[in-house]
A protein has these predicted regions:
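Conserved C-terminal helix/linker of AAA+ ATPases
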Residues: 280-302
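AAA+ ATPase "lid" subdomain C-terminal helix
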Residues: 261-267, 275-288, 328-330, 348-349, ...
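Mid-core helix/loop region of P-loop NTP-binding domains shared across ATPases and GTPases
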Residues: 2-19, 28, 59, 103-113, ...
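A short, basic N-terminal segment
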Residues: 1-58, 82-85, 426-427
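Walker A/P-loop nucleotide-binding motif
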Residues: 57-80
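Conserved catalytic segments around the Walker B and adjacent sensor/switch elements
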Residues: 61-63, 86-102
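Post-Walker A helix-loop "phosphate-sensing" segment adjacent to the P-loop in P-loop NTPases
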Residues: 81-93, 120-123
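Terminal-proximal interaction/regulatory segments of ATP-powered molecular machines
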Residues: 328-427
Length: 427
């Protein structure tokens, strides 16, 4: 607690003695625990596959699958850290290069980032660092590839390149990067490179050329979802480090685990629930974290994630959703695709958008259904044929909040008379 609490003004009451947390950082996804409960089998498999790198051999490439929060990245980082530590003791240098393809999602950026990390991260290697400066833009890809290979050869070691969220890279930029990296060893004499791809999406393999898939998936590992008892063990481990003694009601951790187990066994969701429950109790100046705090945390997470989902929708998807909101505001609780399409065609020009075809509007409606924002069903209307009925599955307030958070304010600036004209022609 600050010595002069009276000088902290607005924040004073929040900086007083913390009754709840001992170290809340251990409850975040970014924290790396020393042990990973219920992932020994996968860790042992990874170690067995990568062990040849310690004997001047090239390990197999690996594809790792599993839903969000199943310990894929944490396990790979753990094994990679152990591999580097053992290699230093054995003086058989190995380096693990971790690339987040959700951010670094083009071939140029991936190759550039690898080259940069090769230059920056070799303080402990006996050779001089290969200080080759590479701009983030401006060079041809083959030039970047050549410079990267220079650094591999300069260092002369075993390298494991981890492409986390590899599906994001493939879906945005195709499989050229993977084709290049899986064939890199034919251009190297003094170094060896292996690839680990991590994905939440089994379907991304359909985007790969068969030759790339064959090279990349020499070994495949699947990380199953955690069940509720396993999530309890994970939360108990973190809670012991993260919370003060006796502040958690005994039902809090089992409830967090049970709720997260329903979300495909997501350890990240379980940790978020536990941490946010503690934060809510802390803000209330409560002495204990209770199941009421867990339920409030669950509502908060679902609210925040849905608003963010809607806020980041493409503008045309927002426009279709906006048309549903207008219909709902004027009394319709269930919509049919024809009404939505007619209102959309009237409003799109006023929203400064190109008017999409009925088929494309229907596709966007299906995407909104997949995101859990709306529900849909096909109904038979007799001689009028079949049509799609829709209704909101998410909170109307959350949807409006996400729609209104548009950088161009197009959905708040549209004149009411234009909306009324669209409704008159659209119903």
């Amino acid at each position: 607690m600050p010595e002069n609490i009276e000088q902290t003004g607005l924040f004073g009451k929040y900086l007083s003695i913390n009754k709840i947390f001992k170290d809340r950082e251990v409850l975040r996804h970014s924290y790396r625990p020393h042990t990973l409960p219920h992932r020994k089998e996968q860790i042992d498999q990874l170690a067995a596959i990568l062990a040849p790198s310690l004997q001047s051999e090239t390990p197999s490439n690996i594809l790792i699958y599993g839903k969000t929060g199943t310990g894929k990245t944490a396990s790979v980082r753990y094994v990679g850290s152990e591999l580097e530590a053992v290699s230093r003791k054995m003086k058989s240098y190995c380096q693990v290069i971790h690339i987040n393809c959700d951010i670094i999602d083009t071939q140029y950026r991936v190759l550039t980032q690898i080259a940069k990390l090769l230059s920056d991260d070799n303080d402990e290697h006996p050779s001089d660092k290969a200080r080759i400066q590479i701009p983030m833009t401006g060079l041809a890809t083959d030039q970047i590839y050549s410079k990267m290979n220079e650094q591999f050869e300069h260092i002369g070691a075993a390298f494991i390149i981890v492409l986390d969220e590899i599906d994001k890279l493939v879906k945005k930029s195709g499989d050229d990067t993977l084709y290049t990296l899986t064939r890199i060893n034919s251009d190297l004499t003094h170094s060896r490179v292996s690839i680990i791809g991590i994905s939440n999406d089994l379907g991304f393999k359909t985007f790969l050329d068969p030759r790339v898939l064959s090279s990349l998936s020499e070994e495949e590992l699947v990380f199953p979802p955690y069940n509720a008892p396993q999530l309890c063990d994970i939360l108990e481990q973190r809670a012991e480090m993260g919370f003060n003694q006796h502040v958690l009601d005994e039902e809090v951790i089992p409830l967090c685990a049970a709720l997260a187990a329903q979300e495909h066994g997501d350890a990240r969701r379980a940790l978020d629930l536990l941490r946010i429950s503690g934060e809510l109790a802390d803000r209330e100046r409560a002495d204990k974290v209770t199941t009421d705090h867990v339920h409030k945390a669950q509502d908060k997470i679902e609210t925040d994630s849905m608003t963010e989902c809607i806020r980041t929708l493409p503008t045309q998807s927002k426009a279709v959703l906006f048309c549903m909101l207008i219909l709902h505001k004027h009394g319709q609780k269930v919509f049919i695709s024809g009404d939505i399409t007619r209102v959309y065609r009237s409003l799109a020009p006023a929203l400064h958008l190109d008017v999409l075809t009925s088929r494309r509007v229907s596709d966007l409606i299906s995407e909104l259904n997949m995101l859990g924002i709306i529900n849909t069903r096909l109904v038979n209307r007799g001689r009028h044929g079949r049509t799609k009925e829709m209704w909101f599955d998410a909170s109307i307030d959350r949807i409006w909040e996400g729609i209104h958070d548009d950088p161009n304010e197009r959905f708040t600036a549209i004149p009411s008379e234009i909306v009324q004209d669209a409704l008159t022609g659209g119903i």
